[in-house]
Amino acid sequence: GAIPGGVNKSLTRQERDYLQEDIYRVIAWSREAVELVRRLHQSNRPLYDGFGAFRSSMLSIVAPDGALDLYDGELRARDADGRILVDRGDCSRYWELIFEEVKPWSYMKFPFLRSLGPQAGWYKVGPLARVQNCDRIDAPLADAARREFIDYGGGRPVHSPLEYHWTRMIEMLAAAEQIKDLLHD
């Protein structure tokens, strides 16, 4: 039978059991990585919060209930201060929300939120946007780490590129927790 997601076979019971043996270690390592990055940021906030920081809007997908979603969801955009600009945007009609500009000095295209225009409508994506755009993460340890990250910013978005690393570790922890749940399903 067909298996979704590009997987070419189901796990055997032996393969599943083998992976179950290590998943708790992976979760522990992921928690340690989140803690390490948190401690680094707290040890020198001026460096970690200021280095390369640039304020911008954020764009990501979230689940219909606002949870972190890495694959299929709805568009959410926030401005640099955290106010929601777009919520529950239809990904299949993204062109109504996002436009691209071409610059004569580059082969790249420069996307922006239509409602803000090309000068103010550019945005960041990736883990820093996803973790700050979602309302929660459906993995308890990762969600606690997300809340701690949001508290670190005083409830306002943070914009330093070094903070991408912290949010990458939060997403890694979420993935490990979700893998554990799938292995026990």
Q: What is the predicted function of each stretch?
A:
Residues 1-185:
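Active-site bordering "gate/hinge" segments
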